[in-house]
Amino acid sequence: MNNEKFNTVVKYMMNKCGNVLMRKGKEYAGENSDRLVSFKRAAGLTGETPTKVALSYMCKHVVSVYDLAERGVTDAALWDEKLGDLINYCILTRALIAEENGENLEAATSKGKIPELEGAVANEKK
C-alpha cells in the first residue's frame, strides 16, 4: 500500500472514530458535562484509577479483534466497528491521562489540527 492510500485509511478511520465518540459522548456522560465520568465512577466502585478502568474495558475490545482474526472474518464493516472501538478506547485513555497530568492539549493543536500530522501529510505530497 502506498502512502497516499495509507493516509486515506487514516483519515477514514479517524472520521469514523470521531463520529462515534461524539455520538456516544452524550449517551455515556448524560447530563454531566464530564465526558469521562463513567470511568471515574467505575474507579470509585473498584478502587482502581480511571485510566486502569479504561484499560480494563479496552481488553474486551482487544479480545474482540483477536476473535475476528481467529475466525477469518473478512467483513470490512465489522472490522471497522471493532477496530474503531479499540481506537476510541485508546483516545479515551489518552484523555484520562491528559486530565490526570493537567495537560493542555489545546495549546498543542492549531485550529483543531495536529501540527505533526498536518506536516507529515504535507511532506508526503511533495
PLM regions: where:
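Intrinsically disordered, low-complexity regulatory regions
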Residues: 1-126
